[in-house]
Amino acid sequence: MTPSILGHLDRLADEHPDKLLYSYLDVNGDPIESYTYASFLQRVEAIAGHLWKEGRFAGGDRLLLAYPPGLEMICAFFGCVRAGLIPVPVYPPSSRGFQSALYKMVHIAKDCQAAGILTSRDYQASLKTNLARSGVSACGIDVDYISGLPWMATEEFVTPIAGRPAAAHSKVLFLQYTSGSTMEPKGVIVTHENILDTCPLVIDHSSPVVISWLPQYHDMGLIGCYLYPALKGGTTYGFSPTDFIQRPILWFDAMTAYRATATAAPNFAYDYCLRAGRLSKESLEACDLSSLRVLMC
């Protein structure tokens, strides 16, 4: 039988259904969206059911995930997996660097032969606005390609769908594309087995508590901060990269408040926090990071 990360999550949900799995925080550190193990899998099942009900996709089809920061992208990721589809996380083009990001998104959609795009209502509306303002049609970007794909806002997929047949799990969990900063983005196959084998090498303790502001379309954020903790029966508290830049003390406050055992960030983030005026002596004195066991960079 093909190993599946969902099999592990199903078992953990049976063992402690009411344990907190994911919580997303606002800029003040207050939770704005949360899921227990049981409620998360219920949502995943609902998304999978609606993807199956649409009848547009076959097992193994690739779906782009284009979401703003939040838990909806994580729900959609697992919903694809439950439905036997292959999620492809992408950076959602926004007003800053719009044309470059849009070019990469179109390239990825073509390269993986995406069958559709999952997103949120708000992001889809903002993308249309940015498209109208940017004049990308004159820049050689094939917008018609992604416009011709089915777009689905997964917030609407909340009710269970009865009668959905069990999907056959592919060995492929998802496709992770490189950033494309120096050349065209290239897709890397990530399997269920890859994640299951490497998880204990990165997080060596049970029930980890992870704090993350990392982008969820990035491998360090998605794998290290949302997949690994879930497979270890842990809890992830996430917040937006923008909120970290605006208020870096939020990272330290969250690690203190929730007794984080693990976190992750690239080198620039630590340099950013050390710059004069970013963090006051008084705010740091109130922090307690003694619970940390793993710090990835």
Enumerate the language-model features and the residues they cover.
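Conserved AMP-binding/adenylate-forming core of the ANL superfamily
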Residues: 22-75, 95-103, 187-196
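ATP-dependent adenylate-forming carboxylate-activation enzymes
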Residues: 25, 67, 88-107, 121-123, ...
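Conserved AMP-binding/adenylation subdomain of ANL enzymes
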Residues: 196-209, 219-261, 272-281
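Conserved S/T- and glycine-rich ATP-binding loop of Class I adenylate-forming
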Residues: 63, 80, 172, 178-181, ...
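A short helix-loop-beta submotif of the ANL/AMP-binding
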Residues: 70-95, 107, 111-116, 208-209, ...
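Conserved adenylate-forming
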Residues: 101, 110, 122-151, 241-297
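AMP-dependent adenylate-forming
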Residues: 8-36, 172-175, 182
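Conserved pre-ATP/AMP-binding loop-to-beta segment of ANL
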Residues: 17-20, 151-177, 183-184, 194, ...
